[in-house]
Amino acid sequence: MTRSFLDLADAGAAGVRLMLDEAVSRKKARAGLPKGAPDRDAPLAGHTLAMIFEKNSTRTRVSFDMAMRQLGGTTIVMDAGSMQLGRGETIADTARVLSRYVDAIMIRTDDHRKAVDLARYADVPVINGLTDRSHPCQIMADLQTILEHKGRVEGLGWAWLGDGNNVLHSIVEAGSLLGFPVRIGCPEGYDPDAEVLAEARARGGDILLSRDPAEVVRGADVVVTDTWISMGQAHAEEKLAAMMPFQVDEARMAQAAPDAAFLHCLPAHRGEEVVDAVIDGPHSLIWDEAENRLHAQKAVLLWCLGRLG
């Protein structure tokens, strides 16, 4: 059975836990292997992943490519300038054609609806590599990182400071599925999507939205932020001024739990959402987090292609 992975809820709590266990296990099993060597069982030998990029990427592109290589498979990379989808071919037609050529499709796009439509018309699994609504693969890596360092994810308090964006949406979703509270600190006008919050609360999610960054971070086990300003974004100076009280600096981290972890999906704008002393400091797990994109996405690929559960 094949399954698409557009949001964490597609897998449910049991599926997410299954993928996390697989990611941790496969990472340990690779000890001593060169990065380009396949896993010893090469479970996706002969399989091909098509990767559609409508947004530039470093981590998503390299981590998915290496994930498929380590699983024994191959990838094909496409962008809007090199495929007919960028010149008027419908999503439905693209999905049907690609389904005849490849075993799975990953898409990174500004338009979540495209990912949904691609999954609707494709006969193979579709994976959300990032959309304007959510970033589930990133949060799988975040969850794996916390699981490795703290031994659990359930019950740990997560604090988010900054823009109410796609990464936050997936954290909120994860909290509602796995049972950890999420406290959100955003300036007025930059809140997360109300529908995302409502869906999470309907699943029993414990969510606090506050304008007070100290209230949000106090005692938190995990502190997370992301870039505030996207390339070419209008009114950047106005947004930057609104966000500055939510910067993660040493004083803010000191308000969290003594052993709190700091996460950032990268790339970081140092001196804006986070200062060097935090991102390079003892609380920071960002390099493990970045590496775990690879391992978490291997588990996602296996789940989507019916090799897990």
UniProtKB/Swiss-Prot annotation:
EC annotation from Swiss-Prot or TrEMBL: 2.1.3.3
Binding-site positions, carbamoyl phosphate: 57-60, 84, 108, 135-138, 265-266, 293
InterPro entries attached to this UniProt entry: Asp/Orn_carbamoyltranf_P-bd, Asp/Orn_carbamoylTrfase, Asp/Orn_carbamoylTrfase_sf, Asp_carbamoyltransf_Asp/Orn-bd, Orn/put_carbamltrans, OTCase_ArgI
GO MF, one annotated term: ornithine carbamoyltransferase activity
Pathway(s) this gene product operates in, as recorded in its UniProt entry: Amino-acid biosynthesis; L-arginine biosynthesis; L-arginine from L-ornithine and carbamoyl phosphate: step 1/3
Gene Ontology CC: cytoplasm
Subcellular location as annotated: Cytoplasm
Cysteine-cysteine disulfides: none
Key word Endoplasmic reticulum present: no
Pfam families: OTCace (PF00185), OTCace_N (PF02729)
Biological processes, Gene Ontology terms: arginine biosynthetic process via ornithine; citrulline biosynthetic process; L-arginine biosynthetic process
Residue ranges the record marks as coiled coil: none
Binding site for L-ornithine: 166, 226, 230-231
Annotated family: Belongs to the aspartate/ornithine carbamoyltransferase superfamily. OTCase family.
This protein's name: Ornithine carbamoyltransferase
Organism name: Rhizorhabdus wittichii (strain DSM 6014 / CCUG 31198 / JCM 15750 / NBRC 105917 / EY 4224 / RW1) (Sphingomonas wittichii)
